[in-house]
Amino acid sequence: MKNYSKDPDRQYHIQVAKGEVGRYVIMPGDPKRCVKIAQYLDNPVLIADNREFITYTGTLDGVKVSVTSTGIGGPSASIAMEELYRCGADTFVRIGTCGGMQTDVKSGDIVIATGAIRMEGTSKEYAPIEFPAVADLDVTNALVAAAKQKNFTHHTGVVQCKDAFYGQHEPEKMPAGYELINKWNAWKMLGCLASEMESAALFVVAAKLGVRAGSCFLVVANQEREKLGLENPVVLDTDMAVQVAVSAVRNLIREDCAGE
């Protein structure tokens, strides 16, 4: 593991310095996914490996692009975004997994978030709860275009963000289970597509920093389909979501260059 703790030019957590990352960053949660995503870049180089944060930098169509893992949840994701921003990044694409909430959101589908329910704690330390967690329109459109280009089954809409994974999957065992179940049912009635753990924080932090952020996910499974006895295989291969994220960054590079 690289250790730059004595270098004041490097960000404390991600251990990256200015000039080592591109303006475009793909952000998986799982550090192990960084290698997989970096393989889609030209000439990827390992920049840093510290805690849950691994960073690679390469190029797409001749433009510097980076991949940085965030770990699980809003606190570490917000740290990664803050420190990457200080190193020059301004466009962030979160890629990860989610659980479907609507019965038509099936295992293996792609979900692209337009906004996120702020049922987590990190964003509340950035903005009052009345402020919406909304994805950047340019990034969202690039993700949708990429999913269409790949002909992948995809859904676009609101996702729910929480801090407790097992609060979602075993609410009846929680002292706050009554509230968790009632809110879950409310989110379903409102058409929420899926549940995950980072987007609300990233969207609000991006708003505070004045940068662009969007999210796309692989649907691993759908507990609502399970409850109804519907087909619900577990799908763990994130390659389709990775392809969407990489193609979306290509779309953004092309659009940004055309607008200069």
Question: What name fits each language-model region?
Answer:
Residues 1-142:
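Metabolite-binding pocket within alpha/beta catalytic cores that recognizes anionic/polar moieties
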Residues 44-49, 151-158, 254-260:
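Flexible, glycine/charged-enriched surface loops at secondary-structure junctions
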Residues 90-91, 193, 212:
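Short acidic/polar active-site loop segments enriched in Thr and Asp
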Residues 133-191:
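Active-site rim beta-loop-alpha module in soluble metabolic enzymes
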Residues 223-260:
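His/Asp/Glu-rich mid-to-C-terminal helical/loop segments that flank catalytic regions of hydrolases
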Residues 200-233:
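Zn-dependent metallopeptidase/amidohydrolase metal-coordination segment
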